[in-house]
Design a protein with these regions (language model features):
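Membrane-proximal lumenal/periplasmic loop motifs of glycosylation machinery
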Residues: 1-7, 20-40, 53-57
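Loop-to-helix entry region of an early transmembrane alpha helix in multi-pass inner-membrane enzymes
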Residues: 33, 37-41, 49-69, 88, ...
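Specific aromatic-rich, kink-prone transmembrane helix
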Residues: 70-73, 112-129, 137-138, 142-143, ...
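Transmembrane-helix signature of polytopic, membrane-embedded enzymes
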Residues: 71-96, 114-115
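Membrane-interface transmembrane helices that cradle and orient dolichyl/undecaprenyl
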Residues: 78-84, 118-136, 146, 165-168, ...
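Membrane-interface alpha helices of multi-pass inner-membrane proteins
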Residues: 90-92, 135-150, 158-161, 181-185
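Short acidic/glycine- and proline-prone juxtamembrane loop motifs at membrane-interface regions
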Residues: 102-112
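Membrane-lumen/periplasm interface segments of specific transmembrane helices
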Residues: 172-250, 255-263
Length: 263
């Protein structure tokens, strides 16, 4: 649980990033848990400023509340005819989640990752309403940050990519594609070049002599993740126009997809 993650890995990682950043950064996978170091590095900066670990937890607790505020703004954009007081009360339902309360008390990357993902949805809704292209950039930027903090949110990139591709086409979207490609390079360099593969097998925080062992094979990962993405996108893809567009995209870019899979 969240307490086990905090005691077994996160608390130690934050302190170690503050004490010896370079060594901890280059050996982060030794901690044996599959959470991104980005948020832990951010929290370690507060230790550098003189705060103690409990004050860091206090900051994280209050940061978590912003999730409710951003969610409320999303509801306002989506349900413009509903009284704002009702929408605010609805947003407070997040407080009922034991997972949210636990992750808010014991600092973890999942809450800030979720905050930026909900912010992604907010910018996406703003784009749907205003059709202002600046919100496509805000959407992608916040999703990149969300994915860096909590990598599991990267699975939503295909949805936004195909949506914006349908709206603008490759030509108008080329700069955004380049931006996303460049944004992915640091994490790819960290995992594959520096060989700090925190996403691979590791120990379960909070439990001694217990581990989850499996080899990290890049080709297998592509197949597994691609299958998961396709499964979750399937309700969207079977809808008339979207399915036709997706089918045409696959046919037009068949050679490119084969080449990418082979690399």
């Amino acid at each position: 649980g969240s307490h086990g993650d905090w005691v077994g890995a996160n608390r130690t990682s934050i302190q170690d990033f503050s004490d010896n950043f370079n060594y901890t950064f280059l050996n982060y996978d030794d901690y044996g848990h599959r959470h991104s170091p980005i948020y832990l590095i951010f929290l370690s900066l507060f230790l550098d400023l003189g705060l103690d670990i409990n004050q860091v937890r206090f900051f994280h607790l209050h940061l978590s509340i912003s999730l409710i505020l951003i969610f409320y703004q999303c509801l306002r954009l989506k349900f413009i005819n509903v009284n704002n007081n009702y929408l605010f009360l609805l947003s407070l339902i997040i407080f009922l989640s034991p997972t949210f309360r636990s992750l808010a008390i014991w600092p973890d990357s999942r809450i800030p990752g979720l905050i930026f993902f909900v912010l992604t949805i907010y910018f996406f809704l703003k784009f749907r309403i205003t059709n202002n292209t600046k919100y496509t950039w805000y959407t992608c930027a916040s999703l990149v940050i969300s994915s860096y903090i909590s990598p599991n949110f990267s699975i939503f990139f295909p949805y936004f990519f195909f949506f914006f591709l349908k709206e603008f086409g490759f030509k108008k979207l080329r700069f955004l594609i380049v931006f996303n490609f460049l944004a992915s390079l640091p994490i790819l360099y960290y995992i594959f070049i520096l060989d700090v593969n925190f996403l691979a097998a590791g120990n379960t925080p909070g439990f001694s002599n217990e581990s989850i062992g499996f080899s990290f094979n890049f080709s297998n990962k592509i197949m597994i993740v691609s299958s998961i993405i396709f499964f979750h996108l399937s309700p969207i893809l079977i809808m008339g126009d979207t399915f036709s567009y997706f089918k045409n995209f696959l046919f037009k870019n068949f050679k490119l997809l084969i080449f990418s899979s082979a690399c």
